[in-house]
Amino acid sequence: MLTTLPTPLKVSLHQKPLAQIAFIAGAVLGCLTQSACSLAPTAPSIAWVSSTPSAQWQSLPATALTATPPTGANVVKLDPQTTYQPIDGFGGCFNELAWSAVQSLDAPLQAEVLKSLFAESGCNFNLCRVGIGANDFALEWYSLDETPGDFAMTNFSIERDRKILIPYIKAAMQYQPKLAVWGVPWSPPSWMKTNNQYQGGAMKQDAPTLAAYALYFSKYVQAYREAGVNLYAIHPQNEPTYNNGNYPQCHWTGAELNTFLRDYLLPQLKKDRVNVQVWLGTIVSGKLPEYVDPVLGDAVTGPQISGIGYQYGGQPAFLATHQKYPGLKMLQTETECYKGENSWTQAQTTFSKMINDLNNFANGYTFWNMILSEKSTSSWGWKQNSLVQIDTQNKKITYEPEFYSLKHFSHFVHPGATRISATGQSDLTGTANPFTTSNLIAFRNPSGELVVILRNPGNDPLPVTLQSGNSSSNVTLPAQSMNTLVLSGW
């Protein structure tokens, strides 16, 4: 892994196409002035960035474009005319422990970390998650109204968030002004639960409590927006199936969630004229029949739900949901947390799952811990992975392998991109490096260039020919590599 972030060769082709093209047939294109470049037609070009265990974010040359039929067994056929779902974006979760780690650094290093995640030159994250009250990487237990029996939410307050989470979000917005944020609670206020505690337990189902909780959400959206945060969506509960962990949780059944959404939350938002998307999430992916069908199958609730958030191994749930509820937005809201190993193998797994989930109609992807300290541990003792690790004692920044898993997507695939058809030849099946839905995906950005993402999980280099229409080019993917190729003018 790298302990300092390399300065990447600019390969993003949007906004200033010619001035930012890194390679044309493996050679560097020079321009005397931006205005001179803008007058020239865009020449067909390829920009390629690759990451391996020993060399992350390396610019590599592709072979010259050719109009001859491709040769060799490993042909990737791109069909930009066959399109699938739009892509809303990528990001991670804003957590209190992360901001605490960032603030241990001096101003220039703080800026480096935030730029690496949110600036156009970095991961370019535009779609992020935040907890409503304490999550498992908060500094301590808390909610936004801990006054028992305060059904009118008289004592509702986001003052704690104004000191920690909101400054974190606003610092990110300096580098990503269009940052969109969605909120989800791990636990309601403890007095609303059957066990009167943040961990474990279930939501009380009496009408006064449910009505108060709906008001809690409405006040939250309004307060965050007044504080300058673009909170575009809310989800009712993080992992409603779980109630046995040593961190904030709350159990709901699918039927209970539907009742809360239909009879309390949606009417309260309408009454308060709060125009915010309501999603069903965040659901552990294997629980589609138990949680998704009761809500989306309801004639009143279903049409008012903007999307679904799935966590962990989402591919079967994404595909099944798309087939049953076509056109519904879906977001991968969290992947495996692991235990702080931050290994290349885990990064390859995350990269593969991103390809898989997006190939099965997910519209976006949010990672869990963007930043942690060298302890990598929650307030309740759970050590986990992160994209960036900050050594708070030695003031050292480490960009972990999964940082590059995310960046290979988020730096190049822009909001509004569309997934396009990308297929490997059938004779690849069964080889050491098959192009399955876990190893190949492609998009067309709003500015027109094609973005092809390839994974070579094998231990040997893999020659590949990219073909789109009459154009083709050869690349050799390094062993154990993650790759992004940007094709302009094809």
What function would you assign to each model-found segment?
Residues 1, 18, 30-43:
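Bacterial Sec-dependent N-terminal signal peptides
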Residues 4-23:
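Bacterial N-terminal signal peptides that target proteins for export
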Residues 43-60, 67-74, 78, 181-183, ...:
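Substrate-binding and catalytic surfaces of secreted/luminal carbohydrate-active proteins
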Residues 57-231, 263:
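N-terminal catalytic cores of secreted or lumenal carbohydrate-active enzymes
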Residues 94, 132, 238, 311-312, ...:
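Residues that line or immediately flank small-molecule/substrate-binding pockets and catalytic motifs
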Residues 133, 184-186, 236-239, 282-283:
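Short, well-ordered beta-to-alpha junction loops that form the rim of enzyme active sites
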Residues 137-141, 189-196, 240-245, 288-290, ...:
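Short acidic/His/Gly/Ser-rich catalytic and metal-binding motifs that mark active-site loops
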Residues 194-206, 239-253:
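Active-site-proximal beta-alpha loop/turn segments in soluble metabolic enzymes
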